[in-house]
Amino acid sequence: VSAAVTAMISDSVREQLLTRAMAFVGASIGVSFTFSLVISPILADSIGVPGIFLLTALLCMLAIGAVLMLPTAPVKRFENFRARAKLRDVFLHSQLMRLNLGIFSLHMAQMALFVVIPLRLAELDLVVAQHWTVYLPAVLVSLAFLMPVLRHAEKTGRTKELFVGAICLVLAAFAGFEIFDNSVLLISVLLLVFFSGFNVLEASLPSLVSKTAPQECKGLALGVYNTTQSVGVFIGGAAGGWLYSVFGTHGVYGFCAALMVLWIIAAQGMTAPARGNVEADS
């Protein structure tokens, strides 16, 4: 689903506005993620876990209805042998490999982190029903800075610098968790730092993939990108649980920080996509 959505946006939005369009998608994902953390305990108490799955199915049906009302976009067709060649090219494209490594690492780290943060908050005597008081402000404040920062980076041609800076911000958050996870207030501040970097990366990565991939295989490149993201989510959840059981919270923080260090090293070889003209009224 996420691959189809990002591919549709890539095909429908002008390149000058692509990063901001992806930012809106990333912001909606961030708000949805936070809302799920807030509402899940309430739903679990009222309708139970089976009810949550039924609610998810209902929301999927509503999403299908919304998609059916969209106008049909023109389809570009390619021969099968060309599609196979392009799949190989997408996997072996050095710049796309760096971006795919990035989204894999980012979501692996996010899932591993949120294996332990709820447990740590509970250890600090914050009841589950009050966890939203930590998550929601961190996400909303971080989103307030997202669009101005992205717009400035686009206009000044400093997309790569912003990208690497956002990774460093996430790394700083994990380093902070290693030292300052002993109070709810400090965890709240560090989550704000984390989401400030995370939201920039979440918005920038699909746009960079779309701009980097060859024109005829953007959808394929975004499909590989989203698959890599999903694999990162799965492995991150599993790795976070195992690391917590063996090494505790600090083992998880250290693992996430190591992922960000590796990503920063890989990102040094990135080449920023050609800068498009930014319209004055955009």
Regions found by a protein language model. Give the residues of each.
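C-terminal membrane-cytosol helix-exit motif in multi-pass small-molecule transporters
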Residues: 58-76, 266-270
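Structural signature of the two symmetry-related core transmembrane helices
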Residues: 161-175
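Cytoplasmic helix-loop-helix junction between adjacent transmembrane helices
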Residues: 1-28
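Juxtamembrane intracellular "pre-TM" segments in multi-pass secondary transporters
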Residues: 71-102
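Helix-loop-helix hairpin linking two adjacent transmembrane segments in secondary transporters
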Residues: 25-68
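Short amphipathic helix-loop junctions that connect adjacent transmembrane helices
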Residues: 115-130
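A membrane-interface helix-boundary motif in multi-pass transporters
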Residues: 45-58, 242-260
